[in-house]
Swiss-Prot record:
Its main location: Golgi. Homodimer and heterodimer with YIP4A. Component of a trans-Golgi network (TGN)-localized ECH/YIP4 complex made of ECH, YIP4A and YIP4B. Interacts directly with ECH. Belongs to the YIP1 family. It holds the Pfam family Yip1. This is Protein YIP4b. One of its GO terms (cellular component) is endosome. Signal peptide: none annotated. Residues 1-146, 252-258 are cytoplasmic. It is a multi-pass membrane protein. Residues 1-106 are annotated as: Disordered.
Length: 280
């Protein structure tokens, strides 16, 4: 077969070729119009970093090192004091330095307790019997108040009056003790009802300590049986006791009600002075 020879096509083959060409033309013509728009791309989601450490790290940049920290010298840490060996030395070091728990007073010797109470009584007695008029806050002088001192002075005054009496010694002691104890309670309630800023037992302690000058006067009058001497001694000790109670009671109440608080105190001390003079 030469190149000039051609293969004749049948009618069915020619129609198939024409049909394929028509379909291809139709597909090219209708293609651009029926293509759906492309789906917009989804936004990029931020990724969450996963850390294996239990603490969340901050995104803030680290602070730059200061120049002073590089030049600053590291101070050496002082070594702790050596522990006491054992026994009484350890207790003395803790109690003397003031560190640790306070000493247990339940296990201390009786003599140490008595010395501590006596020193407290002497300190409070100095504050009351010798008041300082220039003290900034005289009303708070008895912060460490106690009732042993006032109880002792009340009992001592009752015993002194009973020893001075020639008859009915027990009745004299009962009257003196009841007068002083009930009078101190009534005077304290009077100050509180007047709006005074004072503790109940602190006021009882104060009024009991102020009886010390009258105790001294009762002892002098018991030793010297002279009416004129008794009157002079009682007048001096009465003024002393009133002067000792004045700064504390006046500071506890309103200045407008000062007389209402001081007059009953003076009246009770006058009654005690009358008992000292009258008992023979």
């Amino acid at each position: 077969m030469s190149h000039n020879d051609t293969i004749p096509l049948y009618q069915s083959s020619q129609s198939d070729i024409d049909e394929i060409e028509n379909m291809m033309n139709d597909s090219f013509q209708s293609g651009p119009g029926t293509v759906l728009p492309a789906r917009p791309p989804s936004p990029i989601r931020p990724s969450i970093p996963v850390s294996s450490s239990p603490f969340v790290q901050s995104n803030l940049p680290p602070l730059p090192p200061s120049s002073s920290s590089s030049t600053q010298k590291v101070m050496p840490v002082p070594a702790p004091p050596p522990l006491p060996s054992a026994g009484n030395e350890g207790n003395k070091s803790i109690g003397g330095s003031g560190f640790g728990s306070p000493p247990n007073t339940l296990t201390e010797p009786v003599w140490d307790t008595v010395k501590r109470d006596l020193s407290r009584i002497v300190s409070n007695l100095k504050l009351v019997v010798f008041p300082n008029p220039y003290r900034e806050d005289p009303g708070k002088a008895l912060r460490d108040w106690d009732l042993w001192g006032p109880f002792f002075f009340i009992v001592f005054l009752g015993l002194t009056l009973s020893w001075s009496a020639s008859v009915k010694k027990s009745e004299v002691f009962a009257v003196a003790f009841a007068l002083l104890a009930a009078g101190a309670v009534i005077l304290t309630l009077n100050v509180l009802l007047l709006g005074g800023h004072i503790i109940f037992f602190q006021s009882l302690s104060l009024l009991g300590y102020c009886l010390f000058p009258l105790d001294v006067g009762a002892v002098i009058c018991m030793l010297k049986d002279n009416v004129i001497l008794k009157m002079v001694v009682v007048s001096v000790t009465l003024a002393w006791s009133s002067w000792a109670a004045y700064p504390f009671m006046s500071a506890a109440v309103n200045p407008r009600r000062k007389a209402l608080a001081l007059y009953p105190v003076f009246l009770m001390y006058v009654s005690v002075g009358f008992l000292i003079i009258a008992i023979n």
